[in-house]
Amino acid sequence: MTVYVETDFLLALAKDSDWLQGSAEDALDEYEVETSAFSYLELVLARERYEFDYVPLVANLLELVPVRDEEEKQVVLKAVNYYDEGMTPFDAFHAATAETRSMDVLSSEKEYDGIEVERVPLDPTDEE
C-alpha cells in the first residue's frame, strides 16, 4: 500500500533524534511512501530551526521518500539549489517550478533576473 506522508515524517527521518523516528523508520519498511514538493518546501522552511545541511539531506530523502514523478523531483532539487544560492524558500520553489515547466515567470521579484528562469516584469510602466 502507498501512503502519503507529510513533513512530520520527513523531520523524523532528518533529525538526529525525534520521538517519531522509530515509527517513521518502521513505516518505511511497511509501506511505499510518497510526498509532495510542499513537504520539501516545509522542510526547507524548518531548516533554520534545525540547522540541517539541506542540500545533501533533501537529495538523500528524495531517494527514501519520493515525490509523485520526475518533474516534481526536479522542482524540489532545483528549488533547494536556488535556496542555497540565496533565494527565499518560496521564490526558490516558484523559480524551480517555472524552470522545470519551461515557462517564464511574471513577477516583480528581481531575484529571478540572475537565474535560468526568464522574468517578465510585473513592475508598473511609466504609463501607469
Give the residues covered by each predicted segment:
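Short beta->alpha linker loops
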Residues: 38, 70-74, 93
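Histidine- and aromatic-rich ligand-binding microenvironments
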Residues: 5-6, 34-37, 87-88, 109, ...
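A generic structural signal for short hydrophobic patches within well-formed alpha-helices
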Residues: 10, 40, 112-113
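Amphipathic alpha-helical segments within well-ordered protein domains
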Residues: 41-44, 80
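Acidic, PIN/NYN-like endoribonuclease modules and their adjacent C-terminal/linker elements
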Residues: 2, 68-69, 99-128
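Short, well-structured N-terminal submotif of metal-dependent ribonuclease cores
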Residues: 1-35, 47-57
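Acidic, metal-associated active-site segment
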Residues: 88-104
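Acidic catalytic patch
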Residues: 62-84
